[in-house]
């Protein structure tokens, strides 16, 4: 064989070898990329599952808190209502004592005693729940008093409260009902 042919064959074998090496490298890169894609897809799927679980937990918590909020609103006055049962019981006892065979003076005394006890129970219950009476001593305050009439009074200055006609009440710092008062001219 001639030198030229040998060189040609050698060159062709070198090219084929280089192509085989490139093909092997490409196959290895392809396998490496496929593994990487598979790993990334797996990580993505895992992240999606974690997100869906976290979102479901969030939604469940949101529903639970909403339910608890409505229950708190529905039963907010439960303690107050239970505390009102004592004055109610006192009134019922006073009425039952009126049915007993006693003379009128004794009956009147028992009813008066029952009403006083009931009033005391109401006041105690109100204080327990931060319900206080609006003060009506001194100057008229339009924020907590409602002037229903003006009267002449030698003992009071103009604008001072002369008489409380109906008590007013405050729950903590919120006015439940203003006091109905008469004020001096």
From Swiss-Prot:
It is found in: Cytoplasm. GO terms for biological process: protein folding. One of its GO terms (cellular component) is cytosol. Transmembrane segments: none annotated. Gene3D superfamilies: 3.90.20.20, Head domain of nucleotide exchange factor GrpE. One of its GO terms (molecular function) is unfolded protein binding. InterPro entries: GrpE, GrpE_coiled_coil, GrpE_head. This is Protein GrpE. It comes from Aliarcobacter butzleri (strain RM4018) (Arcobacter butzleri).
């Amino acid at each position: 064989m001639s030198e030229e042919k040998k060189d040609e064959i050698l060159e062709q074998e070198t090219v084929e070898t280089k192509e085989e090496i490139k093909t092997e490298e490409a196959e290895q890169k392809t396998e490496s990329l496929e593994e990487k894609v598979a790993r990334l897809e797996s990580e993505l799927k895992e992240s999606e599952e974690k997100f869906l679980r976290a979102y479901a937990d969030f939604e469940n918590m949101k529903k639970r808190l909403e339910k608890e909020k409505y229950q708190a609103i529905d039963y907010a006055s439960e303690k107050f209502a239970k505390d009102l049962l004592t004055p109610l019981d006192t009134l019922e006892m006073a009425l039952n004592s009126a049915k007993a065979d006693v003379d009128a003076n004794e009956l009147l005394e028992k009813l008066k005693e029952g009403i006083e006890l009931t009033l005391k129970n109401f006041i105690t219950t109100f204080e327990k729940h931060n319900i206080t009476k609006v003060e009506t001593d001194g100057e008229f305050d339009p924020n907590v008093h409602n002037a229903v009439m003006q009267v002449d009074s030698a003992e009071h200055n103009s604008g001072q409260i002369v008489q409380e006609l109906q008590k007013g009440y405050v729950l903590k710092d919120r006015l439940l009902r203003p006091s109905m008062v008469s004020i001096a001219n």
